[in-house]
């Protein structure tokens, strides 16, 4: 159990010892298994280690999905070195009636440019469900074959099918 929790980003050191109560508290969280593909230059984010700023994991460094727009300019080189790309497939496990609110990192945000009635405007967005919304979930990233990924960033991507 400890090995899986370490790999899922539970913030446990190699010599950590958990009581049964602590282990069950970690295992009682919602879980997601995320299939990612090798980064072949497509635009977008990917899996990274992130320091959590709010919620049940404040202060911990956990594996997270980070969108390219969330990176500061001085971090763009780090993003370019990423070995894997955004999630392709996701398997989620949660308990009926389980509140997901404690597992959200509300401190994450993105500044984006959108078009509203023909004019470009800057908007503040909170990351979606698979980003900050699943921050406190137990996350496990696994590599899957690249043929599983069919990106659609624009209508032209629908034509470029190999």
Region roles according to the model:
Residues 1-162:
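OB-fold and OB-like single-stranded nucleic-acid-recognition modules
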């Amino acid at each position: 159990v400890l090995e899986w929790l370490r790999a899922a980003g539970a913030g446990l050191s190699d010599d950590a010892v958990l009581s049964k109560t602590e282990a069950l508290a970690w295992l009682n969280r919602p879980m997601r298994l995320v299939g990612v593909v090798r980064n072949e230059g497509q635009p977008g984010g990917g899996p990274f280690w992130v320091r959590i700023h709010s919620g049940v994991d404040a202060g911990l460094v956990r594996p997270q999905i980070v969108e390219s727009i969330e990176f500061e300019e001085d971090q763009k080189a780090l993003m370019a070195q990423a070995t894997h790309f955004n999630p392709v497939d996701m398997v989620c496990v949660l308990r009926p009636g389980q509140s997901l609110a404690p597992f959200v990192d509300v401190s994450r945000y993105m500044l984006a440019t959108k078009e509203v009635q023909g004019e470009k405007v800057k908007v503040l967005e909170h990351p979606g469900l698979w980003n900050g919304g699943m921050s406190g979930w137990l996350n496990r990233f696994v590599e899957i074959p690249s043929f599983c990924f069919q990106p659609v960033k624009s209508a032209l991507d629908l034509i470029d099918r190999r």
